[in-house]
Amino acid sequence: MGSTGSVSAWDEALLIAAIQYPVPIIRGPEDIQVQVQQICKTMDSTKAGYPDLDFIVFPEYSAQGLNTKIWTYDEMLLSLDSPEIDCFRRACIRNDVWGVFSIMERNEDPSQIPYNTAIIINSNGEIVLHYRKLQPWVPIEPWMPGNLGMPVCEGPKGAKLAVCICHDGMFPELAREAAYKGCNVFIRISGYSTQVNDQWIWTNRTNAWQNLMYTVSVNLAGYDEVFYYFGEGTICNYDGNIIQQGQRNPWEIVTAELFPRLADKARENWALENSIFNLGCRGYVGKPGGERANYLTWVRDLANGEYKLPWDENIRIRDGWKYYPEGVKLGPLPKIDE
């Protein structure tokens, strides 16, 4: 159960707003500051329009954009203690709202590739979840694969929150990992271009249905002089049905009223639909208690570091390909000759 969301919500309802943020055009670090200020102003205006709002979600790359020529250089990156993050913290406190934000995060080892990161900040201005993208969109994205797993945190109104970033959501294993750890509201922030528009909608729905959890997904919108980004924020019920879906408009605010307790009750009381439970105790009618032994070859091989496809040797693209023929560039921004 859920509703499309409005300006008010009752006590058990989690009122959430997903912002189809216009894709930023970033030519240097000064442009990042402009976007950070605009994100914070957007929080102020959205809360003013939706006074009962609990949670606001911004897409991947909303602060730092997708300028692939410079996006890995030092000046283009942020850390959790950067002043820009303090701006997000203050905006959450000022508006008494939780927020999800995207940053391209410096690696602790400056000789190593940066991370693509999402953070959740609570209404007290505290970072309560820190996630690094597990599945960068190769070969376009150069980011270091995440090393923090799939964390889950307590949220408002009974929500148990997890975040994935863009292409992560194409892997059913990652949504299942979040659900297995208790998540009942799974957030997906994205900077996808139109190549995978339909697949975006399918996976938002299947991630919800297969795990009996709400999914809240939002993408950048607009054109950045290279790609067009499709917006289409999608909020799905725990039965996989769409509660609310945006169009392709930049600045569209996709809202919904969620009831996390109902997702929990579905997990506890549904039978035929309870795939996440049935996965681990197969055929509990024919075999009391169900069969619990691992029966999946790929699970065993992945756990042993031996994951290999039958066609592995024929896979053509497995490095930086035409996007990074000379490798990923690190260090300070190159000086432009006068």
Swiss-Prot record:
GO biological process: putrescine biosynthetic process from arginine
The protein's Enzyme Commission number: 3.5.1.49
Active site residues according to the UniProt entry: 60 (proton acceptor), 133 (proton donor), 166 (nucleophile)
Keyword DNA damage: no
Domain CN hydrolase, chain residue ranges per copy: 14-260
Reactions catalysed according to its record: formamide + H2O = formate + NH4(+)
Keyword entries, A-Z: Hydrolase
Family annotation (InterPro entries): Aliph_Amidase/BUP (IPR050345), C-N_Hydrolase (IPR003010), C-N_Hydrolase_sf (IPR036526), Formamidase (IPR022843)
One Pfam family per UniProt: CN_hydrolase
Enzyme class: hydrolase
GO terms of molecular function: formamidase activity; N-carbamoylputrescine amidase activity
Function: Is an aliphatic amidase with a restricted substrate specificity, as it only hydrolyzes formamide.
Family: Belongs to the carbon-nitrogen hydrolase superfamily. Aliphatic amidase family.
Protein name, per record: Formamidase
Organism: Photorhabdus laumondii subsp. laumondii (strain DSM 15139 / CIP 105565 / TT01)
Lineage of the organism: Bacteria, Pseudomonadati, Pseudomonadota, Gammaproteobacteria, Enterobacterales
